[in-house]
Amino acid sequence: WDGKSLTKEGAGTLILSGDNDYSGGTTINEGTLVAASTTALGTGLVDNNATLVLDADGEVSAVGGITTHSGATTQLALGTSLDLGDSALIQQDGSTLNVELNSDSVQPLITGGSATLGGDLVVSDASLQARASDAEFQSFKLMDMDSDISGDFTSLTMNLTDQPDYLTVTGTINPEDASEYLLTEGLSWNATATSATPAHGTFTLGAGDSFEVTSVLGDKTGNSDWDGKSLTKLGAGKLTLSGANTYSGDTNVQEGTLWLSGDGTIGEMGSQQAVNVASGATFGGSNGTTVNGKVTNEGTLVFGDSEETGAIFTLNGDLINMGTMTSGSSSSTPGNTLYVDGSYTGNGGSLYLNTVLGDDDSATDKLVITGDASGTTDLYINGIGDGAQTTNGIEVVDVGGVSTSDAFVLKNEVNASLYTYRLYWNESDNDWYLASKAQSDDDDSGGDDTPSDGGDDGGNVTPPDDGGDVTPPDHGGDVAPQYRADIGAYMGNQWMARNLQMQTLYDREGSQYRNADGSVWARFKAGKAESEAVSGNIDMDSNYSQFQLGGDILAWGNGQQSVTVGVMASYINADTDSTGNRGADGSQFTSSGNVDGYNLGVYATWFADAQTHSGAYVDSWYQYGFYNNSVESGDAGSESYDSTANAVSLETGYRYDIALSNGNTVSLTPQAQVVWQNYSADSVKDNYGTRIDGQDGDSWTTRLGLRVDGKLYKGSRTVIQPFAEANWLHTSDDVSVSFDDATVKQDLPANRAELKVGLQADIDKQWSVRAQVAGQTGSNDFGDLNGSLNLRYNW
């Protein structure tokens, strides 16, 4: 022994933790030598033939240099760096350099005079920091020598935690400074022989994770597991490509989202590659991005995003859609375009567009196809706007080639303000339009009844205050809009509430004499009414019923005249089925309304002749009603609201009795009545965003009539009283409702004729029963037929 060197023999571990200054060198022939202090290795050469571990939590000095022979390993523990002074680091072929790193590790980790590299480099216990994009990739300076580094490691192994598969680390001599050795973050797509992982094209991102590739992805040399030119997206996270990528292989979006932004391009112009979007996955692009190749979509294809207006996403190739295509535009600012420079085939897929529902020039998302359109695609429109009459319509699909007549089918009901929009194929230009237009006489196939036009075209449509979404534009043609069906449901609820407050003295009282002690009575009424709205464009069929109870609470008489005061209450229930006018495509929609509630009231009647009721009479009543209303209308769903009504009536008449020779009597009673009504309903905002109100208002109804009734006597007692009554009714104002300030009215005839017939039978001096059938008719196909049954008991 020379007295100044150290040799490690045997399989065990030797730990040096002192402040050593021997100069003869250190030889490790077997086992493990651990340098636990920064000066544990003295000043001589360290000749490593086994295992050297530097674990001093600081910078270990090895100023004599370190040589690691084939089969041997030199390891730098976490927190330990190495200073070789002016000496060399030699890693022979077959050797291993193992370093442990984290984000706090010092740079450079190894300094010295020179380095000769070979064998394997192993990086342990490291983690790659999450990056938002490849533009944030960083390098770690592993070595910084005084002279250029020679040789290189033959392999790099990264024992990383939480390493995304699309990221790798490559060990390289700095091309700008050959004295430095760098560990550089990069894409697995670009991996080389000295990268930690083999090159591949798979990008896996977990739920909530996102990553952007700003660099250009081009074709690479393939290996046994990858062709060097195909991209696969896995995981629920989002991958964004913002470079003008030139790779020529297929793009397979199997999970999560693949998005193109900025200059994002897949393939070079003329490329025949394919983009395949699997079920449950999403693919799309922002304005100006392009796919050169064929796209097959079984998942979701998105064009544009909510932060853009007027975005164009271009597909230079055919598109087959078996999934969902949707605009990423905000519903308030539509205008994105999916541009397909090729043919389009819909294999049961769907297309969702945002559209401002107005006239022909309204903003909309759009699908543009330079080639042919075939197959079948379900179209869904998310609409905003106040609605307007269209002529040709809003172009939503532009086909440069030939389109089959069933290539696109509108699947949801589209309403705005008063109007219903449908999808139409223009055979002359093969384009598809969203239009609000009714079926004309030329369009009528005769298969179903088309609602009457009701005479004056548009006469019952009041333009809104802002100037005119409702008034049809003058394009020189007779184009009528298709109206939404629930117009009639709202009107029907209002009309039924008003109608079931109406009554006359004889509807309520019959013809029986009432004594001063008063009486109680009950009435049941049921009927069916038919009417139109919006100049015949809406058909309304209503079925209604009413049960009413009343009784006298005060009676006064002086032997000849009498005054009776009473109270009454009723329950009403009415259903209205509303059918909209038929669109030019033959479509027709229905809606239903229901109103039920209660009327509470008082009445007062004066008879000039309390005994026979002949001569003059005056009857008055007041009612207050409160109701629950509902409207059910297709895609708009169900809406509920409350309403109230007040009514005041004043009626007078004069009865003339004519005695017949057989002892019976015929009476003639001319009558006049005036009724004031006030109706008020809550405002409603439906699922389309349309505000429905404007139902508050007053109306006057006047009636002039003649009643004829007879008295058939048995002995001194009246047994049967047949009667008939003819009336002329005049109403001052129509039932109306507003949709986003556009007001429409029911086609209720201002003048109506009414006929009532019936029988009253006196069971005895106290009980009487009466049955009546009544009907009304008028213009605009108005009709009302009802029957009622009355029962009265006199005290």
Cite the ranges covered by each PLM segment.
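Glycine-centered positions in the ABC transporter ATPase nucleotide-binding domain
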Residues: 12, 31-33, 50-52, 72, ...
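Outer membrane beta-barrel transmembrane domains
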Residues: 577, 601, 678, 687, ...
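Extracellular/surface-exposed low-complexity segments
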Residues: 1-3, 100-102, 113, 118-228, ...
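Residue-level detector of the transmembrane beta-barrel scaffold of outer-membrane proteins
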Residues: 352, 519-523, 564-568, 603, ...
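Outer membrane beta-barrel translocator domains of Type V secretion systems
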Residues: 240-242, 464-660, 772-774, 779-786, ...
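Extracellular beta-strand/loop-rich repeat segments of large surface/secreted proteins
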Residues: 53-138, 204-207, 282-394
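Extracellular repeat-rich scaffold modules on cell surfaces
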Residues: 1-46, 67-68, 186-275, 374-381
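Transmembrane beta-strand segments of Gram-negative outer membrane beta-barrel proteins
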Residues: 202-211, 349-352, 485, 511-528, ...
